[in-house]
């Protein structure tokens, strides 16, 4: 039986990082994102600089203002966060259809079928993090392990912008030294109850037998017993079947130079072709999307009689679509190429070079 390989990707202080990206003056500042009303609002995300003052998510804004009176308070822009999240989820699904989103900024990916002797899971995780940064200019942390529980635990161990692998050779040591409050799923109330029963670390939890944990914590006790041993049989539950594969890029400055834009379309066509090959799919529609300097999004699609998957075929159609869309007087800030109406293609063995 093939050993499972699960990645948990968690964006670093997601909402705050988006705000810093869109307003560079906020970089390095204590940024608190949340509700507009100071007296009723709640903190959605705090940058690491704000966390140094004790500010954290789900904290009332009134308390955040007391802890960090000179912080930079930004009203949440959920439409923007959803758009960026969509870009990130599209990247995940370009690697595997087994993606289980947990929120706008985190997901589990089962990449067992992609792992090869020359392509370890950690390398794939770094390629995903690279792609996220190229598309969104945001950093993500990743955890890699043989089950979901350990992958999630690992993703939080080397933040921000880090990668941690938990495997059979280090899992016991990591779990035994872990503060009980750092176990995924153990909140303040659970931590307090565990302290009442002298459970402060993973080692303390490990030393309790299963029947005692069930007596103390009910049905949840069995899960705690398993967590102390790094056991988790839960599968990654794919939320939907992928219908398209695409890639998009935001230019560092607004562009209306055809040569620059067409080079980028060629690059995106190649990336899209690579991802189609990785999942052994081809498609019968091609879409080009443009976002103008005024943040207006326009797109054009072409349906095909026969499915395609090569860089040349994708580029030739994308080139035509771009020429139909472009306005020489209007600079653009983003360009995207997507292939849809996917169907199974011929099998292609993967190597590390398919991901570079």
UniProtKB/Swiss-Prot annotation:
It catalyses: DNA(n) + a 2'-deoxyribonucleoside 5'-triphosphate = DNA(n+1) + diphosphate. It comes from the Bacteria. CDD domains: PolY_Pol_IV_kappa. It is an enzyme of class 2 (transferase). Binds 2 magnesium ions per subunit. GO terms for molecular function: damaged DNA binding; DNA-directed DNA polymerase activity; magnesium ion binding. Its cofactor is Mg(2+). PANTHER family: DNA POLYMERASE KAPPA (PTHR11076:SF33), DNA REPAIR POLYMERASE UMUC / TRANSFERASE FAMILY MEMBER (PTHR11076). Poorly processive, error-prone DNA polymerase involved in untargeted mutagenesis. Copies undamaged DNA at stalled replication forks, which arise in vivo from mismatched or misaligned primer ends. These misaligned primers can be extended by PolIV. Exhibits no 3'-5' exonuclease (proofreading) activity. May be involved in translesional synthesis, in conjunction with the beta clamp from PolIII. Monomer. This is DNA polymerase IV. It comes from Staphylococcus epidermidis (strain ATCC 35984 / DSM 28319 / BCRC 17069 / CCUG 31568 / BM 3577 / RP62A). The gene is dinB.
């Amino acid at each position: 039986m093939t050993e499972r390989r699960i990645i948990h990707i968690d964006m670093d202080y997601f909402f705050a990082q988006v705000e810093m990206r869109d307003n560079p003056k906020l970089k390095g500042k204590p940024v608190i994102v949340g509700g507009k009303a100071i007296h009723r609002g709640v903190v959605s995300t705090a940058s690491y600089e704000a966390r140094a003052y004790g500010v954290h998510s789900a904290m009332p804004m009134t308390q955040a203002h007391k802890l960090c009176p000179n912080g930079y308070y930004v009203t949440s822009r959920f439409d923007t966060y959803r758009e960026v999240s969509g870009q990130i989820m599209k990247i995940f699904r370009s690697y595997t259809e087994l993606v289980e989103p947990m929120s706008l900024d985190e997901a589990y990916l089962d990449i067992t079928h992609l792992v090869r002797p020359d392509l370890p899971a950690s390398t794939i995780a770094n390629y995903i993090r690279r792609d996220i940064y190229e598309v969104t200019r945001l950093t993500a942390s990743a955890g890699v392990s043989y089950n979901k529980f350990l992958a999630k635990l690992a993703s939080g161990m080397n933040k921000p912008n880090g990668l941690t692998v938990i495997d059979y050779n280090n899992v016991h040591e990591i779990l035994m030294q872990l503060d009980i409050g750092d176990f995924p799923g153990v909140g303040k109330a659970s931590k307090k109850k565990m302290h009442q029963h002298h459970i402060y670390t993973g080692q303390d939890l490990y030393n309790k037998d299963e029947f005692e944990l069930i007596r103390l914590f009910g049905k949840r006790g069995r899960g705690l017993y398993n967590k102390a041993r790094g056991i988790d049989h839960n599968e990654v539950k794919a939320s939907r079947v992928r219908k398209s594969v695409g890639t998009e890029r935001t230019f560092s400055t607004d562009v209306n130079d055809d040569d620059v834009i067409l080079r980028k379309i060629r690059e995106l066509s190649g990336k899209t072709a690579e991802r189609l090959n990785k999942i052994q799919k081809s498609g019968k529609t091609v879409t080009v999307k443009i976002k103008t300097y005024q943040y207006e999004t326009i797109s054009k699609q072409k349906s095909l009689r026969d499915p395609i998957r090569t860089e040349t075929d994708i580029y030739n159609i994308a080139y035509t679509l771009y020429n139909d869309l472009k306005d020489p007087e209007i600079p653009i800030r983003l360009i995207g190429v997507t292939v849809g109406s996917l169907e199974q293609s011929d099998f292609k063995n993967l190597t590390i070079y398919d991901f570079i």
